[in-house]
């Protein structure tokens, strides 16, 4: 941002913070805080951190006076959160955090990325509550203000977990390290055994959409599968599909084609299996000293609100409407390239150069580095 754009965005943030009803995390006095300031012309973002607040009024006053571009707090609880080094802080545990960010999931138009990452978030929440038995009252859901969602699990049972335990959990969520033999022998139970069977059934169904020559060519391209094995597999395709809905025939696990298919690291079956995982960002979950965005703050890279949500509200939540905090009054921006920007229920066609857009769109474009204020 140039200085004029920085000042424009900072003034909008200041206006928001003057009026907004801010919220603070639980156990405020045990949290470390970090702030990124508006710094026109800076080559990189620098964070002011190792700060603590005993009371929420002190925190809110600090934010309103400082007007930061980003606000973070620690998922960890510390004895001395404002100590200048991590070793001196005295770690007392950390919330279990999951980050679902479109950067790690899908590329494409912004609204389509947001839609896809919502689907991944819904899968994660279902796994946590229905499969792992975590009480939904212990889960806090937050739109990150950028390209995804943060899921905070406050349950004390997880607070003392180290990185290794958290990695095992996120690996389960993401379907990493699953054993095909165990899953196919898992019986008619929910969770990964059911997902594995479903993915295999979908794969076999997909084979049925190919011509006989096409199916043979595909199967014989798999490691260790010859023409005889492939032809035999195709003849008993219906029998195998029926078997996947009941108790597995032990001989199925020895089938050369099945073994080749389920041990592939990529391909048509693996693609279908991966779609059943929730694609959380593993480093965020395993980091027991992570800084995470403060709900109700503004994301300095988008100008949108870091929006806390009730779990039941996620299906109807539209970030490009519900997390927008700035007005529809018109401002002039100078865009670096043409684009279509969906926001506030409309799609704005923005040309390269000078355009007039709603303030909310203008703030977004400036924060993303797509435009300067004109």
Curated annotation (Swiss-Prot):
EC number: 2.7.7.-
Disulfide bonds: none
Gene Ontology biological-process annotations: DNA replication, synthesis of primer
Enzyme class: transferase
Protein name: DNA primase small subunit PriS
InterPro entries in the record: DNA_primase_S, DNA_primase_ssu_euk/arc, DNA_primase_ssu_PriS
Lineage: Archaea, Methanobacteriati, Methanobacteriota, Stenosarchaea group, Methanomicrobia
The protein's required cofactors: Mg(2+); Mn(2+)
Function recorded in the entry: Catalytic subunit of DNA primase, an RNA polymerase that catalyzes the synthesis of short RNA molecules used as primers for DNA polymerase during DNA replication. The small subunit contains the primase catalytic core and has DNA synthesis activity on its own. Binding to the large subunit stabilizes and modulates the activity, increasing the rate of DNA synthesis while decreasing the length of the DNA fragments, and conferring RNA synthesis capability. The DNA polymerase activity may enable DNA primase to also catalyze primer extension after primer synthesis. May also play a role in DNA repair.
Organism whose genome encodes this protein: Methanoregula boonei (strain DSM 21154 / JCM 14090 / 6A8)
């Amino acid at each position: 941002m140039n200085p004029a754009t920085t000042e424009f965005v900072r003034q909008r943030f200041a206006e928001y913070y003057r009026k907004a009803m801010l919220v603070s995390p639980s156990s405020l006095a045990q949290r470390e805080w970090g702030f990124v300031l508006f710094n026109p012309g800076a080559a990189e973002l620098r964070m002011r951190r190792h700060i603590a607040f005993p009371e929420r009024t002190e925190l809110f006053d600090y934010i309103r006076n400082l007007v930061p571009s980003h606000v973070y707090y620690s998922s960890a609880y510390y004895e001395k959160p404002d100590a200048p080094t991590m070793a001196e802080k005295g770690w007392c545990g950390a919330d279990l955090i999951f980050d679902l960010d479109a950067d790690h999931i899908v590329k494409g138009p912004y609204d389509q990325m947001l839609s896809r990452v919502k689907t991944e978030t819904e899968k994660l929440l279902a796994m946590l509550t229905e499969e792992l038995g975590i009480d939904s009252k212990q889960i806090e859901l937050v739109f990150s203000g950028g390209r995804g969602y943060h899921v905070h699990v406050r349950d004390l049972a997880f607070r003392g977990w180290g990185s290794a335990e958290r990695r095992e959990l996120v690996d389960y969520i993401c379907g990493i390290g699953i054993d095909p033999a165990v899953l196919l022998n898992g019986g008619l139970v929910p969770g990964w055994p059911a997902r594995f069977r479903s993915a295999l059934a979908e794969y076999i169904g997909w084979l049925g959409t190919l011509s006989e020559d096409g199916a043979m060519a595909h199967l014989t391209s798999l490691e260790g599968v010859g023409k005889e094995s492939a032809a035999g597999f195709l003849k008993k395709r219906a029998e195998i599909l029926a078997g996947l809905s009941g108790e597995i025939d032990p001989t199925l696990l020895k089938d050369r084609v099945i073994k080749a298919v389920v041990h592939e690291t990529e391909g048509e079956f693996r693609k279908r299996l991966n779609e059943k995982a929730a694609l959380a960002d593993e480093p965020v979950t395993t980091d027991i000293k992570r800084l995470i965005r403060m709900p109700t703050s503004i994301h300095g890279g988008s100008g949108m609100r870091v929006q806390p949500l009730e779990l039941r509200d996620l299906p109807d939540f539209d970030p490009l409407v519900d997390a927008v905090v700035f007005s529809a009054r018109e401002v002039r921006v100078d865009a670096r390239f043409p684009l279509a920007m969906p926001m506030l229920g409309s799609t704005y066609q923005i040309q390269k150069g000078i355009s007039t857009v709603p303030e909310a769109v203008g703030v977004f474009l400036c924060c993303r580095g797509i435009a300067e204020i004109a």
